[in-house]
Amino acid sequence: MTGHIDPLCYLEPSQASGRSFVARKHQGALVMLNLLRFRNTADYSAHLELAPAAPISGASAFQRYIEHTLPYLHASGGDMSFLGAGGEFLIGPPGERWDLVMLVRQHSVESFLAFATHQDYLAGMGHRLAALEDSRLLPLSELPLPSVPRCDIDA
């Protein structure tokens, strides 16, 4: 499940990226684009309290993270709106791949921050960290779709 490995891996936001995110003063709904690359075998060495009795895949560890997370996400007003299997890019660096793509919608930056700092949610974060080799998280502001007439194309 691994692909191109960058010399730097990103599993958590930095202080600088967190400050920049808050400084954007985003208004309204927010969609978080998650690109996720799994470890072949989950690494629970930093979170032994969450480790299963036998080794599991990174994908299985991430499934445990999702199952732990969804109740807190829903309680914060958020929702997972898309989950899809990834692969290599059609347009992008050759050999770069992401195993899973996830879109998470939140009503506001405030609701996202309340969710992301909730102590019970954070108690399961070790599943995510054990699962991932690398990740990207891109906050997106929704734009209105253009209203353009559709064309009929004969196949």
Name each model feature, range by range.
Residues M1-L100, H107, S111, S141-A155:
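Short S/T/G/P-rich N-terminal loop/turn motif that feeds into the first structured element of a domain
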Residues D99-M102, E133-R136:
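Generic beta-strand structural signal
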Residues M102, S111, G124-H127:
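Short, hydrophobic/aromatic alpha-helical segments in well-folded domains
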Residues V104-H107, A116:
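A conserved hydrophobic position in a structured secondary element of the catalytic/binding core
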Residues A114-D120:
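Short amphipathic alpha-helices in soluble, non-transmembrane regions
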Residues D120-G126, L132:
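A common structural junction motif
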Residues A130, P139-E142:
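Low-complexity RS/RG/RGG-rich segments used by eukaryotic RNA-binding proteins and nuclear co-regulators
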